[in-house]
């Protein structure tokens, strides 16, 4: 279908809100983003990393999804059956914490509601906030297939979760056991490592005496957590530490509790650290837990789930753990067993959701046995069907993690999430694990816990495609997916888990490529955070500058694997770029004279400038396509920017004005064809980055088809590549630029004619310059041009050297030398004053000692700048005086 627009529907000024209005809804109504499931077309699929259904998306989400959308838009235009699948994550603890906080405002707890009613309330929250997220996706212009939208708690995905849990359990790869986990005493749940934020805290090392039972002395131990002392069941020393050889096997009398505990030898102990003797608390430290297992030590839990001390803590029973810390230290002092307290900066885990200090805690939990699953996943990386990491260095990061993996605690003490499909017989204690409920359900009690959110999101690439139904058309056609786009901070928590679950349950990699990006940082390179107040709401940026400005800035702002430094200046620069495109497009449209798509005719292209711009267009198509395949979107952005701003806008459009404003109708029509053809192809190349403004411009141009979203991706036309014209135009551009620079140096406006002498390098360049002298005349305004091997620079000439020639412009023809010398001497006086002023500051000791370093540094930069300018003016004065 061909749509013609003979009227220009583009306002004088680019207004993003007007350009973007209505387009997304129209795209959805027309189902441009709906995957066909057409097996005759090559499939290309990306599943969106599901955002937590907890509210606003941040700049990292905007970056992540923009990259995904660029890839899928490009592939759609290249003829692939493209699926960009949307969805959201139920985000167990994050969502439950939000809902509980909301209930707290009404003085209601989840326990007041009961489990079923609380879960219903959370579903209401989900429906409300899911709509917010969709609105943000719309604002960004994401080409999502909403007919396939999924949620990690929907029925299909829940079936997949049960199937995986039961299968792994039956294989002995899921088990229930007591291990040290991250415990949030405020939320009263286990936490995954990613839910623990480590902060450097000014704490203390407490050095204490542990008396030997036989009264012969004591061992010095040091701890940052005295509250765990009641749980000590041994003191460990290194087996080769000569200081303690005679004590191995003897016992300590644990102070305060007066419990006898052994001295054990273990290589875990670092002899050089502290006294070389370490207290072992197997129920409250992961390393001590391992030591305890090796020596069959008892595990004594000394805290309740809320972080208060329990009866195993003796006299400290009922105290908050941090109150107990103080009292225990005081008791050691009273007993004469306190040695010293040293300040100690150390990393302390805090719950991401509640802010509580995380407690390493021995707890009965469900675990996935990781070693065999990791081994399978690592074997995949040795085959042709491996996951390709972009950049490749992250494959090593992934492999190192998998080589050193620990069993995965998958149970959470929450109500919102996939409830563990395990039931306990009320009388016999028998465990039943199954995809369906046990018979005689009233005799059984289901496990109260839910699964870690990452358990369901690890199945995301294939569960969203209908698995475990392997006959599902989407699973058959779109799995494995093509590209996962995600940050390097979740390679361990998500990427690795998707790979091993996919290998285990489908025998396939979950995605062919994983494009790893960094973090969004502020302009100073700092991580964005509430405490720094440097966070940026992407919707606010869109409201001010438009989605296209934000998308292009994010997509082109860094290389794969690198962090992105965000600044409003960069967005504004993109906004200026779009304005340039807008104005250039309006110029083209105003000069097409109602040209229709089928009237575009490139058969009469003879002008060097026309051949050159078509050559540059094809070089740009080649570069953008190739770089896009490698995910080098920063380079794509630079390539498009240079072509559009420099080649098309600054040069070709200016050159095109000659025939457009002339009398030759054939030349006019050819120029219109080249303008329309080039701008149309350029908009298609730019479309994945700037979907809204390119649709607007494309709809106004002569075009074929209903929307640019489904228009054909430009292909290289070898017949349009003319290297001879490229060389010629490059030479002309260099000459014109050099002449303009000389004019600028001596303050001579373009309106004043000059004498121009050009000495070509060889006959090829002489031919180029002579055959295209009209360009030099048009853009240099010479009253006389000489192109000859015989010309030489006169003493008064300003000179420039370009790749194909030397350029001479006699100065006396440009300026009155005496007037110019007087002007320069006045300018010299100005720079002398500036140099004196800034050096006065820098020679002032008070200024140097009191001013901030940044201010002093700025003054030093000014001094260098002013001295350089002064030297330049002096040099010009001396040159002119010699003349």
UniProtKB/Swiss-Prot annotation:
A motif ('HIGH' region) lies at residues 51-61. Residues 811-847 form a coiled coil. It comes from the Bacteria. The keyword Hydrolase does not apply. InterPro entries: aa-tRNA-synth_I_CS, aa-tRNA-synth_Ia, Anticodon_Ia_Val, M/V/L/I-tRNA-synth_anticd-bd, Rossmann-like_a/b/a_fold, tRNA-bd_arm, tRNAsynth_Ia_anticodon-bd, Val-tRNA_synth_C_sf. One of its GO terms (molecular function) is aminoacyl-tRNA deacylase activity. ATP binds at residue 530. SUPFAM superfamilies: Anticodon-binding domain of a subclass of class I aminoacyl-tRNA synthetases, Nucleotidylyl transferase, tRNA-binding arm, ValRS/IleRS/LeuRS editing domain. Keywords: Aminoacyl-tRNA synthetase, ATP-binding, Coiled coil, Cytoplasm, Ligase, Nucleotide-binding, Protein biosynthesis. Catalyzes the attachment of valine to tRNA(Val). As ValRS can inadvertently accommodate and process structurally similar amino acids such as threonine, to avoid such errors, it has a 'posttransfer' editing activity that hydrolyzes mischarged Thr-tRNA(Val) in a tRNA-dependent manner. This is Valine--tRNA ligase.
């Amino acid at each position: 279908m061909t749509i013609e627009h003979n009227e220009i529907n583009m306002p004088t000024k680019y207004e993003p809100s007007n350009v973007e209005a209505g387009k997304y809804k129209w795209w959805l109504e027309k189902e441009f983003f709906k995957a066909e499931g057409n097996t005759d077309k090559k499939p290309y699929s990306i599943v969106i990393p599901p955002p937590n259904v907890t509210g606003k998306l941040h700049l990292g989400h905007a970056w992540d999804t923009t990259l995904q959308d660029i890839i899928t838009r490009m592939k759609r235009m290249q003829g692939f059956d493209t699926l960009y699948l949307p969805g959201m994550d139920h985000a167990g603890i994050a969502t439950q914490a939000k809902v509980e906080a909301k209930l707290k405002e009404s003085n209601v707890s989840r326990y007041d509601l009961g489990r079923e009613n609380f879960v219903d309330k959370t579903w209401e929250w989900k429906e409300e906030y899911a709509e917010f997220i969709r609105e943000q996706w719309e604002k960004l212009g994401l080409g999502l297939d909403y007919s396939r939208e999924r949620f990690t708690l929907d029925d299909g995905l829940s079936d997949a979760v049960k199937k995986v849990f039961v299968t792994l359990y039956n294989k002995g790869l899921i088990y229930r056991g007591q291990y040290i986990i991250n415990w949030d005493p405020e939320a009263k749940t286990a936490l995954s490592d990613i839910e623990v934020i480590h902060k450097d805290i000014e704490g203390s090392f407490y050095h204490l005496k542990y008396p030997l039972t036989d009264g012969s002395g004591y061992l010095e131990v040091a701890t940052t957590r005295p509250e765990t002392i009641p749980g000590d069941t041994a003191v460990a020393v290194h087996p080769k530490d000569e200081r303690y050889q005679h004590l191995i096997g003897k016992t300590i009398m644990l102070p305060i509790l007066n419990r006898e505990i052994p001295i054990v030898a273990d290589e875990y102990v670092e002899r050089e650290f502290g006294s070389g003797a370490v207290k072992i608390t197997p129920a409250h430290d992961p390393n001590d837990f391992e030591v305890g297992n090796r020596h069959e030590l008892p595990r004594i839990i000394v805290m309740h789930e809320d972080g208060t001390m329990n009866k195993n803590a003796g006299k400290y029973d009922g105290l908050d753990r941090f109150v107990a810390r103080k009292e225990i230290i005081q008791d050691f002092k009273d007993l004469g067993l306190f040695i010293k307290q040293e300040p100690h900066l150390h990393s302390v885990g805090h719950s991401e959701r509640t802010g509580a200090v995380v407690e390493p805690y021995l707890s009965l939990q469900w675990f996935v046995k990781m070693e065999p699953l990791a081994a399978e996943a690592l074997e995949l990386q040795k085959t042709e069907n491996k996951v390709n990491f972009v950049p490749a260095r992250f494959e090593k990061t992934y492999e190192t993690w998998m080589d050193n993996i620990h069993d995965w605690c998958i149970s959470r003490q929450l109500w919102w999430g996939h409830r563990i499909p395990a039931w306990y017989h009320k009388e016999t204690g028998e465990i039943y694990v199954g995809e369906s409920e046990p018979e005689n359900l009233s005799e059984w009690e289901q496990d109260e816990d839910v699964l870690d959110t990452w358990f369901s999101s690890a199945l995301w690439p294939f569960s969203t495609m209908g698995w475990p139904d392997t006959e599902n058309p989407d699973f058959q056609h779109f799995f494995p997916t093509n590209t996962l786009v995600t940050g390097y901070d979740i390679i361990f928590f998500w990427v690795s888990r998707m790979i091993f679950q996919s290998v285990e349950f489908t025998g396939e990699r979950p995605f062919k490529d994983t494009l790893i990006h960094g973090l969004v940082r502020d302009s100073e390179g700092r991580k964005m955070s509430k405490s720094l107040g440097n966070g940026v709401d992407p919707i606010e940026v869109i409201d001010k500058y438009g989605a296209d400005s934000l998308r292009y800035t994010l997509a082109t702002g860094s290389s794969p694997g690198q962090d992105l430094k965000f600044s409003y200046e960069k967005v504004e620069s993109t906004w200026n770029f779009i304005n340039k495109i807008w104005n250039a497009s309006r110029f083209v449209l105003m000069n097409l004279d109602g040209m229709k798509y089928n009237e575009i005719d490139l058969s009469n292209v003879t002008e060097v400038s026309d051949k050159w711009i078509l050559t540059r267009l094809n070089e740009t198509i080649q570069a953008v396509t190739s770089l896009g395949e490698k995910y080098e979107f920063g380079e794509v952005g630079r390539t498009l920017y240079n072509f559009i701003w420099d080649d098309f806008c600054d040069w070709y459009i200016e050159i095109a004005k000659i025939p457009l404003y002339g009398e030759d109708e054939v030349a006019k029509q050819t120029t219109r064809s080249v303008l329309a053809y080039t701008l149309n192809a350029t908009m298609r190349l730019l479309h994945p980055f700037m979907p809204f403004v390119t649709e607007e411009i494309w709809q106004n141009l002569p075009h074929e088809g209903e929307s640019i979203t489904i228009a054909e991706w430009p292909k290289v036309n070898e017949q349009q590549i003319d290297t001879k014209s490229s060389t010629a135009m490059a030479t002309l551009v260099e000459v014109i630029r050099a002449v303009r620079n000389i004019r600028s140096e001596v303050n001579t406006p373009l309106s004043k004619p000059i004498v121009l002498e050009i000495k070509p390098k060889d006959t090829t360049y002489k031919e180029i310059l002579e055959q295209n002298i009209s360009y030099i005349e048009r853009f240099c305004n010479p009253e006389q041009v000489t192109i000859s091997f015989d010309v030489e620079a006169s003493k008064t000439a300003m000179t420039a050297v370009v790749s194909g020639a030397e350029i001479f412009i006699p100065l006396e023809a440009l300026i009155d030398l005496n007037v110019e010398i007087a002007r320069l001497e006045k300018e010299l006086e100005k720079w002398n004053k500036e140099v004196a002023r800034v050096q006065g500051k820098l020679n002032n000791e008070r200024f140097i000692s009191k001013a901030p370093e940044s201010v002093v540094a700025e003054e030093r930069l000014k001094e260098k700048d002013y001295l350089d300018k002064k030297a330049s003016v002096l040099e010009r004065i001396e040159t002119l005086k010699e003349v």
